[in-house]
């Protein structure tokens, strides 16, 4: 089974077992909802944990796990990653995609390859994709209708029509 990474444990917070997560998932408020199950991976072993609290704090997601009420219970998890089963994903509407479907796609302008989507930034109005280009500076592409012409997640191919000045160098 292919597990889906949803966060990295950046640190602990306070003394009551709260964890500071760097989320790598879309819809964190649904993914880390109280009562949901996530899996912590360590040495190839996936251990289930139930979310007992969730809140946002700056750019971090703060959670506690059921039964883990002290910093000593969770400190050993710093730096580890959290995963979910692929079955935990909800159906999305048309023109909606999960991050893991977009990250790793190759971006083209016509037949010219621009690079590969390496990261998705949430900006509020629309997402912005970071495109890694071999030997060149990264390019930031807004996920808007005027720029993104088509997405084929099966072929891992994205076709864009860049605005003037969007891609330089």
UniProtKB/Swiss-Prot annotation:
InterPro entries: PRC-brl_dom, PRC_barrel-like_sf, RimM, RimM_N, RimM_N_sf, Transl_B-barrel_sf. GO terms for biological process: ribosomal small subunit biogenesis; rRNA processing. Its main location: cytoplasm. The keyword Cytoplasm applies. Residues 93-166 form the PRC barrel domain. GO terms for molecular function: ribosome binding. It comes from the Bacteria. One of its GO terms (cellular component) is ribosome. Keywords: Chaperone, Cytoplasm, Ribosome biogenesis, rRNA processing. The keyword Amino-acid biosynthesis does not apply. It holds the Pfam family RimM. It is found in: Cytoplasm. The PRC barrel domain binds ribosomal protein uS19. An accessory protein needed during the final step in the assembly of 30S ribosomal subunit, possibly for assembly of the head region. Essential for efficient processing of 16S rRNA. May be needed both before and after RbfA during the maturation of 16S rRNA. It has affinity for free ribosomal 30S subunits but not for 70S ribosomes. NCBIfam families: 16S_RimM. Binds ribosomal protein uS19. Belongs to the RimM family. HAMAP family: Ribosome_mat_RimM. This is Ribosome maturation factor RimM. It comes from Exiguobacterium sibiricum (strain DSM 17290 / CCUG 55495 / CIP 109462 / JCM 13490 / 255-15).
């Amino acid at each position: 089974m292919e597990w889906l990474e949803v966060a990295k444990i950046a640190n602990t917070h306070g003394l009551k077992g709260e964890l500071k997560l760097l989320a790598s998932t879309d819809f964190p408020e649904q993914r880390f909802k109280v009562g949901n199950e996530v899996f912590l991976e360590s040495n190839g072993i996936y251990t289930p944990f139930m979310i007992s609290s969730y809140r946002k704090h700056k750019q971090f997601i703060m959670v506690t796990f059921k039964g883990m009420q002290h910093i000593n219970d969770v400190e050993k998890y710093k730096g580890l990653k959290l995963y979910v089963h692929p079955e935990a994903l909800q159906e999305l509407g048309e023109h909606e995609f999960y991050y893991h479907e977009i990250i790793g796609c190759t971006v083209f302008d016509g037949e010219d390859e621009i690079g590969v989507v390496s990261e998705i930034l949430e900006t509020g109005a629309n997402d912005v994709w970071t495109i890694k280009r071999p030997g060149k500076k990264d390019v930031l592409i807004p996920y808007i209708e005027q720029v993104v012409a088509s997405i084929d997640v099966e072929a891992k191919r994205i076709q864009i029509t860049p605005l003037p000045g969007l891609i330089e160098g």
